[in-house]
Amino acid sequence: MQTLPKERRY
């Protein structure tokens, strides 16, 4: 399963 770069919210 490919891990997609998730949007980091600060």
UniProtKB/Swiss-Prot annotation:
It is found in: Carboxysome. Keywords: Bacterial microcompartment, Calvin cycle, Carbon dioxide fixation, Carboxysome, Photorespiration, Photosynthesis. GO terms for biological process: photorespiration; reductive pentose-phosphate cycle. Transmembrane segments: none annotated. One of its GO terms (cellular component) is carboxysome. The basic functional RuBisCO is composed of a large chain homodimer in a 'head-to-tail' conformation. In form I RuBisCO this homodimer is arranged in a barrel-like tetramer with the small subunits forming a tetrameric 'cap' on each end of the 'barrel'. Heterohexadecamer of 8 large and 8 small subunits. RuBisCO catalyzes two reactions: the carboxylation of D-ribulose 1,5-bisphosphate, the primary event in carbon dioxide fixation, as well as the oxidative fragmentation of the pentose substrate in the photorespiration process. Both reactions occur simultaneously and in competition at the same active site. Although the small subunit is not catalytic it is essential for maximal activity. Belongs to the RuBisCO small chain family. This is Ribulose bisphosphate carboxylase small subunit. It comes from Anabaena sp. (strain L31). The gene is cbbS.
